[in-house]
Design a protein with these regions (language model features):
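DUTPase catalytic domain/fold
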Residues: 1-145
C-alpha cells in the first residue's frame, strides 16, 4: 500500500476520507470562503489541499453519483505525480432550473488513485503497423448494447 502525503493549505480544509472501509474513492470537500451558486458555466471550487503522489500513480477527480443524479457535475480531472499545487474541482450544473449552492465542507467529488505505467509514444506510418484485433476500428457501440 502506498502512502499519499496531504498538505492542508487552509485551516478549514478537510483531508480526503473514504466513506466506508471498502470505498475506492476518497471524498473531496469544498474549502471556500463564501458559498458559491453553481451555474451551467464551469467554476473552479477549491479543495484547500495539495498532494505528494508517488511516481507511477495518478489521482483522478471524479463526480459523486448522488450529485450527478441531481444534475450537479464535477468535471473529471487527472492529477499527475509531479503536480504539487492546490487542488480544485471544476463544477457546473446541467441546467439552471435547479439551483445549487456549494458551501465550505460540502462533499463535492471523489479522488481515486491508480497505478499508471510510464509509457513512450512511437509514431508508426501505416494502419498495418498497429497490428490487427478482432475489433479493429469498430467503436461507438459496435460491440453491442
Amino acid at each position: 500500500m502506498e502512502n499519499i502525503q496531504v498538505l492542508k493549505l487552509h485551516p478549514a480544509a478537510r483531508i480526503p476520507e473514504r466513506a466506508t472501509a471498502s470505498s475506492t474513492g476518497f471524498d473531496l470537500y469544498a474549502c471556500i470562503e463564501s458559498p458559491i451558486e453553481l451555474k451551467e458555466s464551469p467554476q473552479l471550487i477549491s479543495v484547500g489541499i495539495a498532494l505528494s503522489i508517488p511516481f507511477g500513480i495518478d489521482a483522478q477527480i471524479r463526480p459523486r453519483s448522488g450529485l450527478t443524479l441531481k444534475g450537479i457535475m464535477a468535471g473529471y480531472g487527472t492529477i499527475d505525480a509531479d503536480y504539487r499545487g492546490e487542488l480544485f474541482v471544476t463544477m457546473y450544473l446541467l441546467d439552471n432550473d435547479s439551483p445549487y449552492v456549494v458551501r465550505s465542507g460540502d462533499r463535492i467529488a471523489q479522488l481515486v488513485f491508480n497505478s499508471t505505467p510510464l509509457v513512450n509514444i512511437d509514431l508508426v506510418h501505416s494502419i498495418d503497423d498497429l497490428g490487427s484485433t478482432d475489433r479493429n476500428s469498430g467503436g461507438h457501440g459496435s460491440t453491442g448494447r
